[in-house]
């Protein structure tokens, strides 16, 4: 059949449409390849963080504990705390083992609902490690020993030790062991959105059941536990995200007007030639699970690669640390110890309030950046 001019036109239109589709796809590929996540230290930011707790039931005497930033390091300066409310007494207290500070308020039984508002001012900055340069790091031997010990939820023997040995097989230096544990965590664990709060951090149960889904308290807790099991000092740092990420990652920032649920724990390890080094494999899993519409299961994805690279040795300073305490016994409390302290806590004669139940335990957290 002869080709008509109309046929030629239709063919050209098809070719032009195909070219347009190909051209339209290029920016998306380039955009994915150009995603950047590279926090670098050097600029300090100042934040004012306000936590307000209101207890609806005023019929019993009530006790309230609000975590206070207790960290002073090369990445955070905890400056000052002020508070208001109708407590019969309020004061700053600390747990006896780790020194985690908190505002403690006592409220008498009465008709007025207990209210306590805490305002904390901090300065933060990004963290990053120059892996091409070693430093003359020193730390007290007793301090390092402390950060290799087990906790109630973080044993370092049995299945935890066996898993750590398997994950570090063939690695001889502390840095190589930490790298292999980090990679093992990223490849074996995953973010599970249905887990309440930041998770429990029961790492033995995770390994025994083979259920590696969790949140930061579980995943970074497992990372820390595996490091400790092979003799590498490591610790969780419990805190809260304050503002959006400067790199456009939605899941790696917080809404400063409403920070309930923005609590997040990170981790540190002690490397002989580096000192204390930042780590956050849990946030790699969070990006893989939640940053895009579909669950990313390949850590080589262009959205994931820069995050995985940067969070081995660094983190973004849009986050405030509270403390690094485990097995926290709240001063003056009648209830059980907490695995960690990131959320406001309260109790009355009926027991401990559920900090994740907004209907009965109402609190708000907000942040404001103070610009010079």
Model segments located where?
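N-terminal secretory signal peptides
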Residues: 1-9, 20-23, 29, 33
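Intrinsically disordered, low-complexity N-terminal segments that are enriched in acidic
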Residues: 15, 32-128
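A mature extracytoplasmic/lumenal domain signature
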Residues: 68-70, 120-122, 135, 238-240, ...
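Acidic low-complexity segments
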Residues: 94-95, 115-192, 196-210
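Active-site neighborhood of thiol-dependent amide/isopeptide-bond enzymes
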Residues: 170, 174-178, 183-265, 272, ...
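Active-site rim recognition segments
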Residues: 244, 248-372
């Amino acid at each position: 059949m002869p080709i008509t001019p109309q046929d030629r036109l239709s063919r050209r239109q098809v070719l032009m449409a195909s070219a347009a589709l190909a051209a339209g796809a290029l920016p998306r590929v380039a955009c994915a390849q150009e995603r950047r996540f590279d926090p670098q230290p050097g600029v300090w930011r100042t934040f004012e963080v306000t936590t307000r707790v209101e207890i609806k039931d005023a019929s019993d005497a009530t006790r309230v504990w609000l975590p206070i930033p207790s960290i002073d390091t090369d990445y955070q300066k905890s400056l000052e705390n002020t508070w208001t409310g109708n407590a019969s007494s309020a004061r700053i207290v600390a747990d006896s083992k780790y020194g985690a500070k908190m505002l403690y308020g006592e409220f008498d039984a009465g008709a007025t609902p207990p209210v306590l508002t805490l305002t904390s001012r901090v300065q933060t900055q990004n963290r990053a490690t120059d892996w091409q340069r070693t430093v003359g790091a020193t730390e007290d031997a007793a301090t390092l020993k402390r950060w290799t010990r087990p906790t109630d939820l973080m044993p370092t023997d049995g299945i935890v030790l066996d898993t750590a040995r398997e994950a570090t097989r063939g690695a001889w230096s502390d840095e190589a062991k930490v790298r292999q544990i980090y990679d093992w965590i990223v490849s074996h664990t995953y973010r599970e959105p249905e887990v309440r709060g930041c998770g429990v951090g029961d790492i033995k149960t995770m390994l025994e059941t083979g259920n590696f889904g969790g949140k930061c308290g579980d995943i970074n807790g497992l990372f820390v536990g595996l490091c400790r099991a092979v003799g590498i000092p490591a610790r969780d740092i419990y805190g809260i995200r304050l503002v959006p990420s400067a790199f456009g990652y939605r899941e790696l920032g917080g809404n400063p007007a409403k920070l309930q649920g923005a609590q997040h724990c990170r981790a540190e390890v002690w490397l002989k030639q580096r000192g204390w080094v930042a780590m956050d494999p849990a946030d790699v899993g969070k990006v893989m699970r939640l940053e895009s519409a579909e669950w990313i299961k390949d850590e080589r994805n262009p959205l994931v690669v820069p995050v995985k690279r940067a969070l081995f040795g660094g983190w973004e300073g849009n986050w405030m640390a509270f403390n690094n305490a485990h097995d926290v016994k709240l001063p003056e409390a009648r209830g059980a110890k907490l695995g960690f302290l990131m959320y406001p806590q309260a109790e009355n004669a009926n027991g401990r309030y559920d900090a994740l139940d907004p209907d009965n335990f109402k609190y708000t957290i907000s942040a404001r950046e103070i610009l010079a």
